[in-house]
Amino acid sequence: MDITGNKATAYGFIAAAEKAGLKLYLGSYPITPATDVLHELSKHKSLGVTTVQCEDEIAGCASSVGASFAGALAVTSTSGPGICLKSEAMNLAVIMELPLVVLDVQRGGPATGLPTKSEQTDLLQALFGRNGESPMPVIAATSPTDCFESAYAASKMALELYKPFIMRKLEQMGVAQNIKRAKNLVEQEAPEVWGILDEVVK
C-alpha cells in the first residue's frame, strides 16, 4: 500500500491521541498541500477525531487553542502563508502553556509559491517566525514513515511539555514529596491537579 506523507501524518496524530487517551481535534482552513490531512482525519470520527474547517487560518489556530484548553490533543494545519496568519494564536498557546501541534506542510518558493510542490522552504519561519521570541520545538520530517513518527513525537512533546508546570506546583503545595509522586497524580488526574488548572485559568 502506498502512503503519502499527509496520510501518515494524520495516522500519527490519531495514534498519539489514542495512546494519550484524549480526543483529537483539528482546526484548519483548506490550503494546498495541507488539506489532505483535514480530509483524512475527517474520515475517522469513530476514533474520537473532531475536524473543523474554519473560515480562515486565524480561526483554525484559535479554535485549536480552545480545544487544547478543553483537554483535547489539539492540532492545526497549514502551509507557508498560513503560518504567518497563525502566529498570534500560536503565541497565545505559548503564553498560556497549552499543548498545541502546528503542522506546516511546506510549499516551494515565497508568497503563494508552488502549491503543488513540497519542499523545506519554511524552516526559518518555523524556527523563528513568532514575535516575543516565543519558543516552539520544530520537527522536520523527511519521508512518509518519518511523517507518522514526527506527528506522534510532536503530539507527545506538546502534551509532556505542559506537565512539568503542574508537577512543580504539586511539589510546592506539599501535595507530592517528589516529581515521581507528582507525575503519578497527574496521570491519575487527581482532584489536586484540577485545582491547579482552576488557579491558572482564573
Where is each model-derived feature located?
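Flexible, low-complexity linker and terminal segments
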Residues: 1-11, 20, 155-202
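Thiamine diphosphate
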Residues: 1-128, 135
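Electropositive phosphate-/nucleotide-binding environments in soluble metabolic enzymes
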Residues: 3, 7, 31, 35, ...
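Conserved thiamine diphosphate
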Residues: 117-163
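Glutamate identity and glutamate-enriched acidic tracts
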Residues: 18, 55-57, 88, 97, ...
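Mobile "lid/hinge" segments at catalytic clefts and subdomain interfaces of large enzymes
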Residues: 91-96, 107-110, 142-147, 155-168, ...
